Amino acid sequence: MAPHWAVWLLAAGLWGLGIGAEMWWNLVPRKTVSSGELVTVVRRFSQTGIQDFLTLTLTEHSGLLYVGAREALFAFSVEALELQGAISWEAPAEKKIECTQKGKSNQTECFNFIRFLQPYNSSHLYVCGTYAFQPKCTYINMLTFTLDRAEFEDGKGKCPYDPAKGHTGLLVDGELYSATLNNFLGTEPVILRYMGTHHSIKTEYLAFWLNEPHFVGSAFVPESVGSFTGDDDKIYFFFSERAVEYDCYSEQVVARVARVCKGDMGGARTLQKKWTTFLKARLVCSAPDWKVYFNQLKAVHTLRGASWHNTTFFGVFQARWGDMDLSAVCEYQLEQIQQVFEGPYKEYSEQAQKWARYTDPVPSPRPGSCINNWHRDNGYTSSLELPDNTLNFIKKHPLMEDQVKPRLGRPLLVKKNTNFTHVVADRVPGLDGATYTVLFIGTGDGWLLKAVSLGPWIHMVEELQVFDQEPVESLVLSQSKKVLFAGSRSQLVQLSLADCTKYRFCVDCVLARDPYCAWNVNTSRCVATTSGRSGSFLVQHVANLDTSKMCNQYGIKKVRSIPKNITVVSGTDLVLPCHLSSNLAHAHWTFGSQDLPAEQPGSFLYDTGLQALVVMAAQSRHSGPYRCYSEEQGTRLAAESYLVAVVAGSSVTLEARAPLENLGLVWLAVVALGAVCLVLLLLVLSLRRRLREELEKGAKASERTLVYPLELPKEPASPPFRPGPETDEKLWDPVGYYYSDGSLKIVPGHARCQPGGGPPSPPPGIPGQPLPSPTRLHLGGGRNSNANGYVRLQLGGEDRGGSGHPLPELADELRRKLQQRQPLPDSNPEESSV
């Protein structure tokens, strides 16, 4: 058994040969497991009307998983994903109406999205939701799992207004540390502290403090524990923002890490109720040799060790390289981040009009540092006692000169044409005594990648399709129960970290190099390492590259496959499939006792797409036994075995199959196809009959319809009509006789004529649309009467010469128009639509 340090020596040698990039650039997972193959090993939860399982909070001591979704909260048992409780917390209808009136979508935004859910104390949870763009917070009783609806708190600064905006938060000793956007428009980014014994404190609204950030994660590190300098605990925030220090490109986005001290009280005069310990630095994740820089930080996971000194951060990044999407995972050590925050500052030079390293003397006490033993010895027991020169300096210099670089100086792995969304990590002890870090990475198309860190490179164990074309929105891992939870838009899933049953053979189990799995010699099964710890009965070697003898040295029998009998006609092109054990294996064929070359023109050809050996124009000399081995890292695993017999006859093309292997499926497909054809035939006949009936009805209706020419009765000669004051409102009601554009409606019927003299009085004005007093009605400007059967009469202005009686002129013009109008095919032709 090779020692663990041998991995590092081998990696260094490979890197010197220039092939190290193959161990982290676009790695291929060894196994691909589709969603159909996960049916028996994955538990799922979904509920009608419930969406966006965004917030997952695990409490190991109680064995419960708390889930925040859209307008709902759930409690599940960690072991079996059994529902323990559910709460409906919807935004009121009036809040949703206000949200839509402000221009937000009532389909995707105007709901109560749960964005913060964490334990407040031993008996209550603290929960915050967007509440239709009016954030609210309240408490949940953990014992009864009920929501306190009597005391909703304002969620401003604790939860984002917009569910699509980045947010992160922590509850530490009853104090809420939150990074979010502090207003409806999302223009006030803030990192603040609420609740608890201290008063509220937040960042300055300055572009060089926070500039359009997208917050993705936060972490509490108890650095006061065991500190020889009396240091304070710290809270770290991770985000992307538009960089201010690059004058060449103002739109440059970079990844950041910022930190504040838990005991920060703000300044006495300068920076009152503002952070005095806020510092930030750039997170670098790049492949300089390929000129690829990952600046879009998407998620961060904090992996804690036995001591806070061993804290590790894993970041998920995205980038665009030409026309290709790239994703990467970078690893950062807490010690590296601390060194950057203790280094030089960056400042904006007014004279040079650019950002540069600050080279002048730094004030004392050091700006941005936490209160420690040195401060106390010099009379500074609180940030309220810090001098103004220190506070003014940190107000103008929150950005550090040095950058936080990843371990190894490059990404752990890079994947092309993939968007990573989330990552979680676990430390697993191997049977060789080493501890391995296993990463679980969610993707934008619903896959979960499982990878193990082997010193300077990564081994991709497998890829699992946990969701069908839905992004992995959230991930959380239970180290005590060894299960993983993943949330998407429509469902929540639980899967075991140690799914070892898929490996049926010793070689396959060992080659998986999965720290959770080992081969049990006694039971001849691949089992989880937690089920048995006796090294003499379990076979596992994660770091060893040469596993060819691992199974043989324990006397494990090789797997033998039963040959399939194939009889073909001479001259036939024969296709012999070979199902490989993994994506990293390649096929090795033998004929008789001889190895077959990868390609022999005119005789043998291996088709990588079909993963099959093609025997072209088989002859009698091709009769005999064929064996296919799945070869991986020098180890051969029997995959397929065929016994071929070539007989004389006409030439056809055959593919090797087991006898009657899929005959039942063929008959089932034939019956199903016949049923579909019958249903389609009946549907066509039914539609044809309906169409014929409709045509007959239309013909009968047209025969019964008579078209009568419409004639307007002639008006008797009478004096001009002068409406009286009593009937003026009725006859000139603007609602009944005017269109919205001022046109007059002409409705069939006879108005009551009353004697009177003089021109008619003008109608009352329409609000917002004053009309001139009409003295003439013009039909020429009306809409096309042939289009809809209506005649629109415009009200004229002043009389264009001459006086006369308008009603006879109206009757003549209207009669001409009606005679020209085409009759409409109406069911009741006596009823005019003029």
Swiss-Prot record:
Instruction: Please list the residues that carry the modification Phosphoserine.
Output: 743
Protein name per the record: Semaphorin-4C
Q: Which family does it belong to?
A: Belongs to the semaphorin family.
Describe the protein's quaternary organization and the partners it interacts with.
Answer: Interacts (via the PDZ-binding motif) with GIPC (via the PDZ domain). Interacts with NCDN. Interacts (via the PDZ-binding motif) with DLG4. Interacts with PLXNB2.
SUPFAM superfamilies per record: Immunoglobulin, Plexin repeat, Sema domain
Query: Tell me, which GO biological process terms does this entry list?
Result: cell migration in hindbrain; cerebellum development; muscle cell differentiation; neural tube closure; positive regulation of stress-activated MAPK cascade; regulation of postsynapse assembly; semaphorin-plexin signaling pathway
Q: What is the lineage of its organism?
A: Eukaryota, Metazoa, Chordata, Craniata, Vertebrata
**What phenotype is described for loss of this gene?**
Partial neonate lethality, due to defects in brain and neural tube development. In about one third of the embryos cranial neural folds fail to converge, leading to an open neural tube and exencephaly. Mice without exencephaly are viable and fertile.
Species of origin: Mus musculus
Q: How does it sit in the membrane?
A: Single-pass type I membrane protein
